[in-house]
Amino acid sequence: MVLAELGGRITRAIQQMNNVTIIDEKVLNDFLNEITRALLQSDVSFGLVEKMQTNIKKIVNLDDLAAGHNKRLIIEQAIFKELCRMLDPGKPAFAPKKAKPSVVMFVGLQGAGKTTTCTKYAYYHQKKGYKAALVCADTFRAGAFDQLKQNATKAKIPFYGSYTESDPVKIAVEGVDRFKKEKCDLIIVDTSGRHKQAASLFEEMRQVAEATEPDLVIFVMDSSIGQAAFEQAEAFKETVSVGAVIITKMDGHAKGGGALSAVAATKSPVIFIGTGEHMDEFEVFDVKPFVSRLLGKGDWSGLVDKLQEVVPKDLQNELVENLSQGNFTLRSMYDQFQCSLRIPLNQLFSMLPGISAEMMPKGHGEESRVKMKRYMTMMDSMTNKELDSPNPKIFNESRIMRIARGSGRLVREVMEMLEEYKRIAKTMKGIKIPKNGDMSKVIPPQMLKQMGGMSGLQSLMKQMGSAKDMMGMFGGGGK
C-alpha cells in the first residue's frame, strides 16, 4: 500500500488505544502525539499537522462527553474527518467526456515519471471506453519520443511526435489537430520536464498551453519530493492553470505525506497515484477510501471493483455458476491465477480491514507471481479432461510424469502444484457463492468468518509460505 509505514503506525496507535481500559486525557494525548510523529516523519508539513491536532482536541473534549459516549469511536471519527480535510481541496477535477474531444496537458519536474504516467492515464481511460491518443511535445529530453512511442505501442494507443521538428508548440498543435480529426475524445499532450529554475522551459510550457488550450493541466509529482512539494506546485501553478495532480512512485517511498498534503494545500485535487512500474499499477485517488485504508479500515468497495475490473464478465458468470455448484477445477484455478496476476498484491492487501502493507514481506509479491506462472506452465501440459475434473485422484504416477516432462518441471513440483490446488479448492468450496452473481456480498463477512475472523486472516498472512494462496482465493472471489 502507499505510505505503508505511516498506515502501519497509525493502525498500531489505534490498536494500542483500543487496548486501554479507560480513555482519559493522558491516553488521548499519547495517541495524538504518536499520530503527530508518524505524520511528521512521513513529511507532512508541520503547520497542517498542528492544525489537525488542534481540531481533533476541539472535537474530542473528554470533559464534555457524557459517560455513555463511545470515546474510542469519537476519536477515530475525528482522526478520519481531519485526515480527509487535509487531503481534500474541496473541488473536483475536470473529467473528460466521451464523444467530445478533451485535451489534457501533462507537466512536471524532470524524473517524476511524467511520460510513463501519460501512458497509464491514457490506458486507464481507454479501458473505460475512451478513444485516447498521445502527443509527444517533449523535444528537450533525448529519447523522450522513443519512450512514449514504446509505451504507446505496448498499450495499443495511437501517438504522434517527430524526430526532426524541434518546436514543441508546433508538434503539440499538429498532434492535437490530427487526433481531433480522427475523432479521439481524449488527447494527452506530454511536455518537457522542467526544473523550477529553468525559466525558458516554463515559458515553453506556457506557450504550449496557450496554443493547445487544454481542458485540464495535470501536474505530475514524485512522491519522494517531501515538503518541497508545496513550493514546486506553486511554481507550476503560477505559469499554467494546474487543475489536478498525479503522484508517482508511491510504492517505493515511505514518506509520501509531503506530496499528498502539500499538493492538497495548493487546492489542486490529487486524481491518481502511481503504485508501480506496470501499466495497471495506477489507482484512482479517492480521499475517503484512501484514509480508510490508511487507518486500517480497508476498502471493500474498492476491492470488489478491482476484482471485477480484471475478470471478464463471461468468466465471472462461468465461475460463479461453477462455484455455486461446488465445482472448483484446475481450470478454475488457472483462470483465477490469470486474473490474480493482473492485481498487484500490495493493492489487494491494502484494501483489507486490519491489514497493513507492512505485513507483506519484501519481494513476496514477485515470488508469488513467479510461482503462479510456473504452476500455469504445468497446467498448460494437461489435457482438457484433467483440467476439468473436480477429482484430483485421477492424477496417477504416469500422468504426473507426463505433465512434468511436458512442462520441463520436476515431478515433485507437479505434486506440489496439485497439493496447492487441493488447499485452494477446499477453501473455495467453503465459500458460499450466491447464484445471482452479486460478488459484493461474497467477500466481507463470510470469508473472514471462514478464516477465523480478522485475527485469523492476519495470522494466516504472517504464516503463509506463499502469498499466492490469498491471491488465488481473492481472484476467485472476484469472479
From Swiss-Prot:
GO cellular component terms, A-Z: cytoplasm; endoplasmic reticulum; signal recognition particle, endoplasmic reticulum targeting
Major site of localization recorded for this protein: cytoplasm
Reaction(s) this enzyme catalyzes, per UniProt: GTP + H2O = GDP + phosphate + H(+)
Region listing for G-domain, in residue ranges: 1-295
Pfam families per the UniProt record, alphabetical: SRP54, SRP54_N, SRP_SPB
Gene3D superfamilies documented for this protein: P-loop containing nucleotide triphosphate hydrolases, Signal recognition particle SRP54, nucleotide-binding domain, Signal recognition particle, SRP54 subunit, M-domain
Subcellular location: Cytoplasm; Endoplasmic reticulum
EC class (word): hydrolase
Gene Ontology terms: biological process: SRP-dependent cotranslational protein targeting to membrane
E.C. no: 3.6.5.4
SUPFAM superfamilies recorded: Domain of the SRP/SRP receptor G-proteins, P-loop containing nucleoside triphosphate hydrolases, Signal peptide-binding domain
InterPro entries for this protein: AAA+_ATPase, P-loop_NTPase, Signal_recog_part_SRP54_M_sf, Signal_recog_particl_SRP54_hlx, Signal_recog_particle_SRP54_M, SRP/SRP_N, SRP54, SRP54_euk
Example of a GO MF term: ATP hydrolysis activity
Segments for region (M-domain): 296-479
Source taxon at top rank: Eukaryota
Residues the record lists as binding GTP: 108-115, 190-194, 248-251
SMART domains for this protein: AAA (SM00382), SRP54 (SM00962), SRP54_N (SM00963)
UniProt keyword Nucleotide-binding, yes or no: yes
Function, as annotated: Component of the signal recognition particle (SRP) complex, a ribonucleoprotein complex that mediates the cotranslational targeting of secretory and membrane proteins to the endoplasmic reticulum (ER). As part of the SRP complex, associates with the SRP receptor (SR) component SRPRA to target secretory proteins to the endoplasmic reticulum membrane. Binds to the signal sequence of presecretory proteins when they emerge from the ribosomes. Displays basal GTPase activity, and stimulates reciprocal GTPase activation of the SR subunit SRPRA.
Free-text comment on this protein's domains from its UniProt entry: The NG domain, also named G domain, is a special guanosine triphosphatase (GTPase) domain, which binds GTP and forms a guanosine 5'-triphosphate (GTP)-dependent complex with a homologous NG domain in the SRP receptor subunit SRPRA. The two NG domains undergo cooperative rearrangements upon their assembly, which culminate in the reciprocal activation of the GTPase activity of one another. SRP receptor compaction upon binding with cargo-loaded SRP and GTPase rearrangement drive SRP-mediated cotranslational protein translocation into the ER. The M domain binds the 7SL RNA in presence of SRP19 and binds the signal sequence of presecretory proteins.
Quaternary structure note: Component of a signal recognition particle (SRP) complex that consists of a 7SL RNA molecule of 300 nucleotides and six protein subunits: SRP72, SRP68, SRP54, SRP19, SRP14 and SRP9.
Protein's UniProt name: Signal recognition particle subunit SRP54 1
Organism: Arabidopsis thaliana (Mouse-ear cress)
